Amino acid sequence: MAYTVEAAFNTLHENINLSGDHRDTANKRRDRIVELLKNQFTILEAFSAGSIPKYTALRGHADLDVIVALHYGKHVKDKLPSVVLQTVRDALGAYRTGARTNGQAVTLYYDTWPNVDIVPVSRVTDNNDTVTHYEVPNSRTETWIPSRPKDHAALIEEASKKCGHNFRRIIKMVKEWNRVHGDYLTGYHIEVLALKAFSSDLDDLPWQIFMFFDHAQKLVKERLWHQVSYVDDYLSVSSRAEAVKRLETAYTKSLSAWYATHGANKDHATAIGLWPIHLRKITRHSNQRTAAKSP
C-alpha cells in the first residue's frame, strides 16, 4: 500500500500529540499548590500556564506551569530572584522538589504525571491598579523578566481560530523537530515564531511547515521582541548560531521535500525521506506494524 506525505504527517501528529483535555488536572494541581503555599505566602493570584493548557504539548514532554503571584512588599521587594525561588522551595521542604534548568521555577514532583513547575512572580500594575504584566525570576542572571502569559495564551488561541487546526499541529511538529535536533529553542520561542509566521488559514500543511522554517531561519538570527520582552535572551551566541544552522538545513530539506509532491509530482517516498521532521522513521514503524498484522 502506498504511503503518502499526508498520511505520514497524520501519523506523526498522532504519535506526538498529547490528546485529551487536561485542564481539570491542571486546575487541581494549581489549587493544591496554593494550599501548600498559602500559610507562608500572601498569594494574590494563581493560574495554570505552559504547553498543556495551550494545547501545544508533546506527549511525554509536556510541561505544566503554575504561576503564583506573590505579594510584592512581603515576598519580593529587595530580594534577588534566587532568594525568592529558594523561599518557595523551602516552603515545600516536605516534598520532592528541584530547580528548572532555565532558573525560573521550582519543580514539584508528583507520583503521577505531570510534574509542576511553580513560577513565583510579582504583579506590575498601572495607576488604575490594572495588571500590566508579571515579573518572572531568573536565578541564572539574577534579573526579573517581564511576561504576559495570559495574553500569550490568548494569542495562541486567536491564531488557532484564524489559521485553523494546523496552527497548533505545526507548533507541535516543530517542537518535536527541535527536540531531536539539539533542543536549542524553547517551546515558548517556537510558539512566538509561529505567531510571527502565520496569520491566515493554513490549509496546506507541507507548504506551511516549509514556510515556518523559511520565517524561523531569519527570525532566529536577530533578537525577537514579543509583548514586553525578548523571547530569545536565553540563547548564547554559539547556541543561536547552532539553532540557525539547523533551521537553515531544515529549510533547504523542506523545500526539496515539498517540491517532490507539488503539482504533478507524486514522489512521496522521496518527500518522506527528505522531510526533516523524521517522517521516514514514522513510515518505517507504520510498515512494521502493518507487517506484524499480516497472516
What is the predicted function of each stretch?
Residues S82-D129:
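Conserved catalytic core of two-metal-ion nucleotidyltransferases
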Residues F47, P53-R59, L70-K74, V84-L85, ...:
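Extracellular/secreted glycoprotein ectodomains characterized by long, lumenal stretches
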